[in-house]
Design a protein with these regions (language model features):
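Short gly/ser-rich anion-binding loops that grip negatively charged ligand groups
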Residues: 28, 72-76, 93
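An amphipathic alpha-helix signature
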Residues: 14-18, 39, 79, 83-87, ...
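A short, mixed-charge helix-start or loop-turn motif at secondary-structure junctions
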Residues: 20-25, 68-71
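Divalent metal-dependent phosphate-bond-processing catalytic cores, especially two-metal-ion Mg2+/Mn2+ enzymes
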Residues: 12, 24-51, 62, 115-199
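His-Asp-centered metal-binding catalytic motifs of divalent-metal-dependent phosphohydrolases/nucleases
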Residues: 53-72, 78, 82, 86, ...
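Amphipathic alpha-helical segments within well-ordered protein domains
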Residues: 22, 39, 43, 66, ...
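Short, Lys/Arg-enriched N-terminal segments with co-localized hydrophobic residues
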Residues: 1-8
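Hydrophobic, well-structured mid-protein blocks that either form specific transmembrane helices
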Residues: 86-127
Length: 199
């Protein structure tokens, strides 16, 4: 059993979940190193709270497994798709319904643009941990890599050559718009005090 961080998940179960995550990750901006950084932050933040660490670890490992579906169809929300995929996978490998549902809820609400904010402490910690990986220079670098993968420009200009700060219907979403919409606002959107301090 893995007993670090106050949890008792069987090592074989942890390895199964990790292997499933590794099989699903093929995006340079949301690769396994992103997942491991999110997991590290989640476990660090969780030291201050009484949380279900098995749920938190599974949610951290599986939170981006819906990315490939979103790449194939940009209308999809990777958090919603990933939540369903994670739930199905956890049930398949023998997780209890309540824990699998809890992981599903954490993943479904981890996205910055999610209409439903995270409710449980595990979900709030996952959200904060994922957003920590979007802060600072690393966050900017990851966003530029992602924009390259999905073939979106660094910035858009209007007919007069002025850089557009917001999205409009005539232009693709750009890095500059993502920075203005998300990256510079992250620091006021954390749920835990520790994440705010780390950021």
């Amino acid at each position: 059993m893995i007993e670090a961080w106050g949890m008792t998940m069987e090592k074989s179960m942890y390895i199964k979940i990790e292997e499933h995550m590794l099989a699903c990750m093929n995006d340079g901006a949301h690769d396994c190193q992103h997942i491991y950084r999110v997991l590290y932050h989640a476990l660090e933040i969780a030291k201050d709270y009484d949380v279900d660490r098995e749920v938190l670890i599974a949610a951290a490992l599986l939170h981006d497994i819906g990315r490939e579906a979103q790449f194939r169809d940009p209308r999809l929300d990777h958090a919603t798709v990933g939540a369903d995929l994670a739930y199905d996978y956890l049930k398949k490998i023998g997780w209890a319904e309540d824990k699998a549902q809890h992981v599903k809820a954490c993943i479904a609400t981890h996205r910055f643009r999610a209409e439903s904010p995270p409710v449980s402490m595990e979900a709030k910690i996952l959200y904060d941990s994922d957003k920590l990986d979007a802060t600072g220079l690393l966050g900017i670098a990851r966003t530029i890599v992602y924009k390259g993968i999905v073939m979106q420009p660094l910035y858009n200009v209007d007919d007069e050559g002025n850089v557009l700060e917001e999205d409009d219907d005539d232009h693709q979403h750009s890095f500059f718009q993502e920075y203005n919409f998300k990256l510079k606002k992250l620091y006021n959107r954390f749920f835990t005090e520790k994440a705010t301090m780390i950021a």
